[in-house]
């Protein structure tokens, strides 16, 4: 396994680097830039193109720990979400800042050509995926980016995302067709070569010992020479050193490490069909395919430095978790670097005092925002462009020192844990919904085969079941014509009422019939009459 710390001077292009030049003599220039990273080299290139004399002082070598050089994704935006930007500075200023970030991305694309930088390996498209089901949020975000901020985006539903990425870990996605990827190592050295061709002078292994920003001509002291300039641009990020320690302490150092797998062959194409870069909304996963069949994967951020080799096992396990079809993968190369993260999440771009400029704190969006900052500062110095004042609301805030690093580490752990829990819950709900649909389909098929009516859908938990609807009463069947003596219809029993028990007057006919039906006993005969009658019968 190859292990590097920054990745900018290791690898196949390391032998092509020229011999470093140190500043060993006094020098007067128009602009002195401290730091040969992405922002500093962009200022040098633009100012040299405009005719200014430029000197770049780098304490180590070109591109050492340059932010944004790892996976090389270039797209508009900042570390702070758009919604939070609008809440803080309003819609109009947010729109202006977004346009500046788009200009920065376009600037990188214009420079990253095979003519300017051979082997830059530009690839198109970036996909941002969600770990949970966010259908409604996806629609609102698409409307904001496409309508309000005039950015070309596409919304991908779950089926589309999973057709490109064979995993159930991701749900919806936002596709940026105008985003692209470049080889960050080659780009930072390509910027240096372009700046030299335009007349800029770059001195490596030349740390700054002290800076005196007072007066019209500022003074910079190095171990072996002195330099004077009308403008000083501080583009060293978290590595400005002792002379500007207070400025460095406004940035929280954040390390991120990446690994490159050994060639995976055709099985990589079966698991990952998308050829651009992929990042999740929680900032945990960031990967893309390089060299056709190798996977470059970045680890989560941490506020503590470590050897990149320590993260090889974690990266391999993460790849296997997301794409089980790949099985165990071998990490053949690891590298890493540090970025400066501000407390408010926005870059530090502006003028600290007359002639003293700062460009740092680019966070995760290093490539487009550093290009934007370099253009703004160079044009402000030489052309009077005042658009850098859009960043005035984002002041220099102390990052908390060691306490801030501990807090940042804890917040990062909490964020990753929360994202993992939310993702697991979302996948559980999805599996439950699939099982419910399968059960209903089986029940419907059974009802169809049995000839019964479909089953009533069960109500959600907490709701009472619907009351059954009684079928209408069917009318009695019609009598058949051949039935000569139909049976009498049974009469339903009715409860008698008090009226039924009252005596009703009889008609004359009813009274006669009743009298004839009753027996009439003979009237009683007196005793003397009875004896005479018996004697008469005997005689």
Spans of features found by a protein language model:
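Glycine-rich active-site loop/strand segments that organize a redox cofactor
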Residues: 69-100
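Helical element adjacent to the flavin cofactor pocket in flavoenzyme catalytic cores
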Residues: 171-230
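N-terminal Rossmann-like FAD-binding beta1-loop-alpha1 element of flavoenzymes
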Residues: 31-56
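C-terminal catalytic lobe of FAD-dependent flavoproteins
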Residues: 281, 305-307, 312-317, 321-428
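Flavin (FAD/FMN) cofactor-binding and adjacent substrate-gating region
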Residues: 2-12, 80-86, 110-190
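Extreme N-terminal leader/targeting segments of oxidoreductases
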Residues: 1-31
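Glycine-rich FAD pyrophosphate-binding loop
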Residues: 49-69
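Active-site substrate-recognition segment that forms the wall
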Residues: 106, 114-122, 208, 226-267, ...
């Amino acid at each position: 396994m190859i292990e590097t710390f920054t990745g900018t001077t290791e690898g196949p292009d390391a032998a092509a680097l020229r011999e470093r030049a140190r500043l060993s003599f006094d020098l007067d220039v128009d602009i002195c830039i401290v730091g040969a990273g992405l922002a500093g080299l962009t200022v040098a290139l633009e100012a040299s193109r405009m005719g200014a004399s430029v000197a770049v002082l780098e304490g180590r070598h070109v591109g050492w720990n340059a932010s944004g050089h790892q996976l090389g994704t270039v797209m508009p935006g900042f570390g702070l979400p758009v919604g939070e930007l609008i809440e803080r500075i309003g819609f109009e200023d947010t729109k202006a800042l977004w346009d500046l970030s788009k200009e920065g991305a376009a600037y990188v694309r214009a420079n990253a050509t095979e003519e300017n930088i051979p082997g830059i390996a530009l690839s198109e498209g970036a996909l941002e995926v969600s770990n949970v089901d966010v259908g409604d949020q996806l629609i609102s975000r698409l409307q904001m980016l496409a309508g309000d901020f005039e950015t070309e985006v596409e919304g991908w539903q779950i089926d589309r995302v999973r057709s490109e990425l064979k995993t159930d870990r991701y749900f919806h996605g936002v596709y940026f067709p105008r985003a692209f990827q470049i080889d960050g190592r080659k780009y930072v050295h390509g910027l240096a070569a372009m700046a030299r061709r335009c007349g800029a002078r770059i001195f490596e292994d030349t740390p700054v010992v002290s800076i005196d920003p007072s007066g019209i001509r500022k003074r910079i002291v190095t171990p072996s020479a002195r330099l004077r300039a009308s403008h000083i641009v501080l583009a060293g990020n978290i590595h400005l050193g002792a002379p500007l320690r207070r400025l460095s302490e406004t940035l929280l150092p954040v390390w991120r490490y990446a690994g490159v797998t050994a060639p995976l062959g055709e099985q990589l194409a079966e698991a990952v069909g998308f050829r651009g870069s992929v990042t999740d909304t929680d900032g945990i996963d960031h990967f893309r395919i390089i060299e056709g069949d190798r996977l470059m994967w970045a680890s989560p951020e941490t506020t503590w430095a470590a050897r990149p080799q320590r993260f090889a096992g974690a990266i391999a396990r993460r790849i296997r978790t997301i794409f089980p079809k790949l099985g165990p993968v071998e990490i053949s190369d690891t590298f890493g670097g540090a970025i400066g993260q501000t407390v408010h999440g926005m870059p530090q771009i502006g003028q600290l005092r007359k002639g003293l400029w700062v460009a740092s704190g680019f966070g995760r969006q290093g490539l487009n925002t550093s290009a934007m900052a370099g253009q703004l500062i160079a044009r402000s110095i030489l052309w009077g462009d005042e658009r850098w004042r859009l960043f005035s609301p984002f002041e220099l805030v102390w990052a908390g020192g060691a306490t801030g690093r501990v807090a940042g580490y804890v917040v990062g752990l909490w964020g990753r844990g929360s994202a993992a829990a939310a993702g697991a819950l979302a996948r559980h709900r999805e599996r439950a919904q699939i099982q419910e649909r399968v059960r209903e389909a089986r029940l419907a098929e059974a009802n169809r085969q049995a000839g019964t009516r479909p089953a009533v859908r069960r109500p959600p938990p907490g709701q009472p079941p619907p009351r059954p609807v009684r079928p209408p009463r069917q009318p009695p069947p019609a009598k058949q014509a051949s039935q000569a003596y139909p049976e009498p219809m049974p009469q339903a029993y009715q409860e008698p009422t008090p009226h039924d028990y009252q005596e009703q007057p009889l008609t004359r006919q009813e009274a006669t019939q009743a009298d004839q039906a009753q027996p009439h006993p003979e009237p009683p005969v007196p005793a003397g009459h009875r004896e005479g009658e018996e004697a008469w019968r005997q005689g």
